Amino acid sequence: MLTVGDSFPEYELTACVSLEADKAFETIHHKSYQGQWRVVFFWPKDFTFICPTEIAEFGRLNGEFADRDAQVLGVSVDNEFVHYAWRKDHPDLRELPFPMLSDIKRELTEACGVLGEDGVAQRATFIVDPNNEIQFAMVTAGSVGRNVSEVLRVLDALQTDELCPCNWNKGADTLDATKLMAGA
């Protein structure tokens, strides 16, 4: 699995971006959001149980990510038509404000090192900085949904470019190593 300090791989994938038939699909590639932070999360399968809870929460907090100049991108190995059908079928997914990328060839999923032995993506999350460097990587067990608020908290911490202690939240004090070393 790729980790902190690695470059995020190049990709060009079809995404479901709308339920309007003439605007439903768009090609998204590694340069689409160049110069922005990206939160790229993978889910195992469409039409499942935990996945829509996570996707809906990323959608609910999308404005918070956008306020931090971060583009949310969701990815699974399902095709774009399955994404479309799922969005249309599931009330919590109909108004998603971010692209659902189709990695049907499993190229990005494999390049990130999150393709499971069962042929589907693991429940992985990456925060990628504007220089395309991974600053955060996490995988949870398939039976455990991720905490999207924690992903946002980590993004906030990364964007301070300062030392953030345990349980730090936006607006809280960061650490000053020089003062701490001096005993102040």
Descriptions of predicted regions:
Residues 1-184:
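Chalcogenol-based redox active-site neighborhoods
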